[in-house]
């Protein structure tokens, strides 16, 4: 069964690139034609690259990895949050905080501060003894932290891979990932640089339907990876139980041999 069909890609407008005057010549090989001043992306290639990205994400998650979904522009925010939440993966959909990967230790401290403020807000007497102004300041701090870091609240280490919508806008995230040798999976529009992406998906990174469809493909790969991981763990547990059983059966025989009286 295909990960996604040509019809779905067409319906979502994945084939529409940028105006011909706004392009990156390195994307030439992914362009099918030009129509009314707009580049049309070769969806046959998109299908091939989607399969490669899907398998990579699936295997990454199957081996215990995590995928960070990143898309802070308006057209990507909802898709990134919805699909990441659907499969329990972290996401960034408002602002990329510099050092989010390369200085994760400091980011972790801010995450702890956010959780501290959330616990204070949830407690019955969390703000007891504080003035209205202090409560207001703490609430503002919590809201700001939640907006920027809420999607990575449960991320305890740097991710195994990144799914990025618009590598130009998220160039800092791409640079940090490269610095830490974290693979990048991303939509490549006709104005992007394919050299900065490990697993490219040629397509429209501006249309809401396109970003939603392609993010859904990646979240489905995560879902499949989780299933594969569970199956492997179950198989390993069965093998371990099978190895232990013969040992348990041999133990009484050995005990009887030790207790038998010596012949006179």
From Swiss-Prot:
GO terms for biological process, alphabetical: translation
Entries under InterPro entries matching the protein: Ribosomal_uS2, Ribosomal_uS2_bac/mit/plastid, Ribosomal_uS2_CS, Ribosomal_uS2_flav_dom_sf
Residue ranges, annotated region (Disordered): 225-264
Domain of life: Bacteria
GO cellular component, one term: cytosolic small ribosomal subunit
Listed Gene3D superfamilies: Glucose-6-phosphate isomerase like protein, domain 1, Helix hairpin bin
Membership in a protein family: Belongs to the universal ribosomal protein uS2 family.
NCBIfam families: rpsB_bact
HAMAP family (alphabetical): Ribosomal_uS2_B
Record-given protein name: Small ribosomal subunit protein uS2
Natural source organism: Corynebacterium glutamicum (strain R)
